[in-house]
Amino acid sequence: MRKIVVRVVLAIIVAILLAWTWYATQLPRQRPATDIKIEASAENIERGRYLAVNVLQCVDCHSERDWGLYGGPPVEPIGAGRACMTRKTIAAGVNAGQENFPGRLCIRNITPDEETGLGSWSDGEIIRAVREGVNKDGKGLFPIMPYFIYKHVADDDMQAVVAYLRSMQPVKSVRPERQIDFPMNMLVQLWPEPFDSPAMAPDHSDSVARGRYLATVAR
């Protein structure tokens, strides 16, 4: 009987070690960022501005908001990040109801600042983060960043968004690293999925299909 117990315990230990090795070495699922270099044309930047501000809501989420005004418009400096959410946060606006957050999450600076923003990221790394939920360092993003929605953004539109982000005024704005509680910290690594097929926008002349597409990718 004792031998059976020992074998069972050893089997459990081995299974745990194998599971941990798989988790530590294989997650999050990811592919290398593409080496794409996006054209910073005026047309691309303007298209990206429309999408980032009005559809994907990048600017609203990554800027402080004035909740004393209707709709809580973003305030300067635009795109420089927001205060952290923690268990003690008194959430307001779009974050209402997110008290007791499982750890600490700080909305990042997405301006092209080299040290604290996206300035040191490649275009491909930004696209991979937005669509696939994996950051520059290969870690899974917390799904408050809706990459599971943005994976449907067409390639041309995604490139336009990056062109706009590159055109923003760089702001030096440090945000603390996240600290996510167990088991959420492990789940965050499970959710990202590689995305390697082209995404196409519908024909602009088909207003119904175009509207459906925008409604699908809208935040």
Predicted regions and their residues:
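The canonical Cys-X-X-Cys-His
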Residues: 48, 55-65, 126, 161, ...
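Gly/Gly-Pro-rich "capping" loops immediately C-terminal to redox-active cysteine motifs
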Residues: 65-123, 141-155, 178-192
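Alpha-helical membrane-targeting segments
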Residues: 18, 22-30, 176-199
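C-terminal capping alpha-helices of c-type cytochrome domains
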Residues: 21-23, 120-136, 149-175
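N-terminal type II signal-anchor transmembrane helix
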Residues: 1-32
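Electrostatic cytochrome c docking/interface patches
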Residues: 30-53, 188-216
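Extracytoplasmic
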Residues: 53-56, 105-107, 140-142, 217
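Detector for the c-type heme attachment site
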Residues: 61-67, 131, 146, 166-167, ...
